[in-house]
Swiss-Prot record:
Primary location group: cytoplasm
Membership in a protein family: Belongs to the methyltransferase superfamily. RNA methyltransferase RsmG family.
Purpose of the protein: Specifically methylates the N7 position of a guanine in 16S rRNA.
Any GO MF annotation of the entry: rRNA (guanine-N7-)-methyltransferase activity
Binding site residues for S-adenosyl-L-methionine: 78, 83, 129-130, 148
Gene giving rise to this polypeptide: rsmG
Protein name listed in UniProt: Ribosomal RNA small subunit methyltransferase G
Gene3D superfamilies for this protein: Vaccinia Virus protein VP39 (3.40.50.150)
Broad EC category: transferase
InterPro entries per the UniProt record, alphabetical: rRNA_ssu_MeTfrase_G, SAM-dependent_MTases_sf
Annotated NCBIfam families: rsmG_gidB (TIGR00138)
EC number(s) from the headed UniProt entry: 2.1.1.-
Source taxon at top rank: Bacteria
Amino acid sequence: MTPQAFYLALEQAGFALTNHQKEQFDTYFKLLVDWNRKINLTAITEENEVYLKHFYDSVAPLLQGYIPNEPLRLLDIGAGAGFPSIPMKIMFPKLDVTIIDSLNKRIHFLQLLAKELGLEGVHFYHGRAEDFGQDKQFRGQFDLVTARAVARMQILSELTIPFLKIKGKLIALKAQAADQELEEAKKALQLLFAKVLDHQPYQLPNGDGRYITLVEKKKETPNKYPRKAGIPNKKPL
């Protein structure tokens, strides 16, 4: 997917980018490739692949209408090189974006990226979701939580739901095993007082299959969740 094809696809979906936004995506791509030589950010570095599998895939929830262009607080867990939240922020500048990532080198890259792109209302924290999820500054504070290729739904739900306000929503971007993951996560979602609102398949422009899973928080998360770092992964709910 060339940059031009990416812009055209967004325009056809009703999201015409400004020249400034196009320049931001171009700068993002160049910085990603440059920094990937220093630290391992992604295995995907060819321009057409980045625009398809990183940029387009990241903004799919916007194209599908899951996120409005409003000043909502969005938390991205394990964003790595900034996906999906930074492409979302470029498209919807009103979003207030927080990223938590366990690798400090990636946080350093994201800080530099935000500065180079001129992004405001972006915040970066180094650490584990399990620890931040028990911190009052973060727990129950977000309208939206996004996660892309972080963990299976059974684990991911415990790492993300505690951050949401009541009626806040988790938007999980998943590959083809999503149906099986949801079945495995039923108990975890019940324990966390969360409910699946939507679970939709979609295709990237090249035909690759993906899923968007939308989960709503119904009540306050029990205090014992998330459990200590590492436990959700070793002993899923």
